[in-house]
Structures are given as structure tokens and as C-alpha cells.
Amino acid sequence: MGVNLKDLIPEEAKMTIEDLRMLRGKIVVIDGYNALYQFLTAIRQPDGTPLMDSQGRITSHLSGLFYRTINILENGIKPAYVFDGKPPEIKAKEIEKRRKIREDASKKYEEALRKGDIEAARRYAMMSAKLTDEMVQDAKKLLDAMGIPWIQAPAEGEAQAAYIVSKGDAWASASQDYDSLLFGSPRLIRNLTISGKRKLPRKNVYIEIKPEIIELKKLLEKLGLTREQLIYVAILIGTDYNPDGVKGIGPKKALQLVKAYKTLDKILKIIPKTEFPIEPEKIVEYFLNPPVSTDYKLEWRAPDESKIREILVEEHDFNPERVKNAVERLVKAYREHIKSKQLGLEAWFS
């Protein structure tokens, strides 16, 4: 889920990307689990049923990964994906919370189907989506065939992506979660994999979702905080490591407290008595110094057309003609854009 910093992001620290070609030549490290989960929840039949092959295996994530990655490449962006490793022990409460939410949503989905409430069924189906190890392995195989690099993180993928960007090996990390900023990513791109028109829940209203870039340096300057103090704010609101946060404290109140008292010790003394699942100091330390791998390569290769067809058409029953056309687009994008020089937004970020 990540921490909810949305209401604290000032306009001066973010920029809407009206055209993905503005990111042409940029290397962007995408949170793989985050992206696959988005595809898994969004790409569904009207009643909430995911796309499946003839053997009943879910393919929504592969469809989203394949076509969206091609779209990203066609705009001259050089994508790489990073995947979560073993979740840290301090995340156990959040993982259990998510499991219960999925179980409850699954029951409500079945009930909605029995009642013929298609809209509710779709909503609960999305909430009950689960990303399995098999799905992740299939995604990695597809990326290999497409010639797209991926990195296996030892723990949190967002931390690994932030490390790669902070080392200068990529221009930005991409995720829906603001945790990337807490892990120190200089730039975070949101909505990269889900841009387009989306229907609002329970309303017959569609909104246009566009990618946006948040720059950590500008964010901290505008808020008047250090990165460590931003982590304090997140802890008060609630993170994946203390999902309940502090009762009665929302984003704006948390910001006020941190700016007034500045240190964690002073903040903890004045807030309502709270039982943290783990010492707040350990949460701070994890965000500042998470486990990351220094052994990674960002190398793009020519697509393996026959392997892509084998995975999508032969193994998972994708439409042969549609895959053929998409592969042609992929090959063209690789030839035209993958080696292009970084252009675009230096002026805005200088």
C-alpha cells in the first residue's frame, strides 16, 4: 500500500507529463510488483473476471506488461523493472492485513455475483487480486524475451530502484507508492503504467490519469524538511511497517508536529500513546539503509520474436495477429529509440 503523502506534495515539487515523449532517452526503473498488480486489477472482464488462457491461468498481468512496455519504448523511454525479494520481517503486520482484505473481498465478490451486481463484483474482484510467484516468473520470462532488463532486489523493490537512481544509473524510479521518496529516490514517476482514462468507483464518471514526476529535493525544500524528517511524517501517518500510524494524526497534522518538534524523540513524547509493531527508530533506519544489491546490469537487447510468440501465443493463447503486430512495433521501437540520447526535462530540473 505504501504511505499516503499525496496531500503533502506541493505543486512546485511535481510536474504533469502531458506527453511521454518528454521522457525520451531517460532510463526509468519500474517497480515490477506494483506494475503487475495494477495490470492484474485493472485488466478484467466487466464482471471482474481476469483474462485467462485455455487452461484457466490468469494472463492479465502479461497482457498489461507486454503492451504497456511497448508503449513506453515507443515513446523513447528505456524501461527496466525491479522485483521484490523476501519481505522484511518488519512488514509482517501489513502483509497479514492485506491477506485479510483479499479474503474479505473474495467473499464479497462471490456474493455480488450471486446478486447480479456486476459493478460491485468487479470492484471486489479487483480488491481480491493476488500476485503469485508463478505470475512473477512468467513476467520475468516475457521481459527476457522482449530484451528488457530486470533486477532482483534482496528485499523491497522500491528501495532497490531508489538506489539505482541515486547512483546515477537511471533517471527516475516509477511506482504508485510514495515510499520510493522515503527510500531516497531523487525522482519518482507516478502513473507511468496506468495512464489513460479510468472510471471512478461507484460513479459513471471517467477521469484522465496522466503521469507525474515528483522531485525529492524540491519536495524537501518546499516542506522545510530533511529526508529523515519526511520519514518521521510517514511514521505518524502510517507506513508498510506500522500500517496503523498514530490515531488521530493525518498528513497535515503529522507535518506540523515534525516541523515543530524536529527530532523523533521529542515527537514520540508528545503524541498520543501508541503501540508500534516495531520501534520507530528501526523503521527510520530501514528507510535510510535498506538491503540493496550492487550487482545489477541495465542492458537492453534486441527482442526475441520467436520466444515472445512461444510465451504469449503458444503457452497462453494470446491472439496471434495482435501479438504479431505488437512485436513489429516492439522491434521498430527498439531500433529507433532504445539507444537515443537523454533529452527532455533538464531545464525544469536544473
UniProtKB/Swiss-Prot annotation:
Residues 1-102 are annotated as: N-domain. Mg(2+) 1 binds at D31, D84, E156, E158. It holds the Pfam family XPG_I. Mg(2+) 2 binds at D177, D179, D240. The keyword NADP does not apply. Its cofactor is Mg(2+). Residues 120-262 are annotated as: I-domain. Keywords: DNA damage, DNA repair, DNA replication, Endonuclease, Exonuclease, Hydrolase, Magnesium, Metal-binding, Nuclease. GO terms for molecular function: 5'-3' exonuclease activity; 5'-flap endonuclease activity; DNA binding; magnesium ion binding. HAMAP family: Fen (MF_00614). Structure-specific nuclease with 5'-flap endonuclease and 5'-3' exonuclease activities involved in DNA replication and repair. During DNA replication, cleaves the 5'-overhanging flap structure that is generated by displacement synthesis when DNA polymerase encounters the 5'-end of a downstream Okazaki fragment. Binds the unpaired 3'-DNA end and kinks the DNA to facilitate 5' cleavage specificity. Cleaves one nucleotide into the double-stranded DNA from the junction in flap DNA, leaving a nick for ligation. Also involved in the base excision repair (BER) pathway. Belongs to the XPG/RAD2 endonuclease family. FEN1 subfamily. This is Flap endonuclease 1. It comes from Staphylothermus marinus (strain ATCC 43588 / DSM 3639 / JCM 9404 / F1). The gene is fen.
